[in-house]
């Protein structure tokens, strides 16, 4: 194995108590289709999928600030993949730039569209590829929508999980436009995830 450089633990972290995590199962699933995670990627996935004694997410809000090109997308991709398949979650993935949304969409949709992955392909209901309206729909009721942010983002819609990628560019107006989309979640187990890059 090649030698790893760089720190594998957060410089600064606040994580509360939790009963258990689905992180290990999510990693096993994701690693069938993408590379195995680095230590810190696994840790972040464990935090996102941590549960309390009621089997609800222990952390309703999760945030990560990390320099560019360090692998944030692996953990988030694995988080979405597991949420869609295992829990049938309705997920809204938002970012500031279209190419970021395109990249995440292509990475997540590829395993479902590959007919050699029979179990995943059978679970797939539809893939929507129209720019600005990209989405993956599963037969278990789960779906994920990929979009760039606007000041009227997601009004009138309901999601279980909202992800703000490129959150360092998130405006108050954009956040307000999607603030209440998880309040009507039928699972009553909502989560909001912020991913950002620290300023130079």
Question: Which positions does each model-derived feature cover?
Answer:
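Phosphate/NTP-binding elements of NTP-utilizing enzymes
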Residues: 1-200
């Amino acid at each position: 194995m090649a030698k790893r450089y760089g720190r594998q633990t957060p410089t600064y972290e606040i994580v509360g108590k939790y009963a258990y995590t689905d992180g290990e199962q999510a990693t096993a699933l994701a690693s069938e289709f993408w590379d195995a995670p680095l230590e810190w990627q696994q840790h972040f996935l464990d935090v996102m999928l941590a549960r309390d004694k009621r089997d609800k997410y222990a952390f309703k809000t999760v945030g990560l600030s990390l320099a560019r090109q360090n692998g944030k997308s692996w953990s988030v991709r694995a988080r979405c993949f597991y949420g869609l398949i295992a829990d049938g979650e309705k997920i809204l993935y938002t970012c500031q730039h279209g190419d970021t949304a395109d990249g995440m969409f292509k990475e997540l949709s590829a395993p479902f569209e590959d007919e050699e992955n029979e179990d995943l392909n059978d679970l797939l209901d539809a893939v929507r590829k129209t720019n600005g309206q990209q989405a993956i729909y599963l037969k278990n009721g789960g779906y994920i929508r990929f979009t760039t942010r606007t000041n009227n983002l997601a009004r009138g819609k309901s999601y279980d999980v909202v992800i703000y990628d490129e959150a360092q560019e998130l405006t108050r107006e954009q956040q307000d436009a999607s603030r209440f989309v998880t309040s009507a979640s039928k699972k009553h187990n909502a989560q909001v995830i912020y991913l950002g890059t620290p300023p130079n």
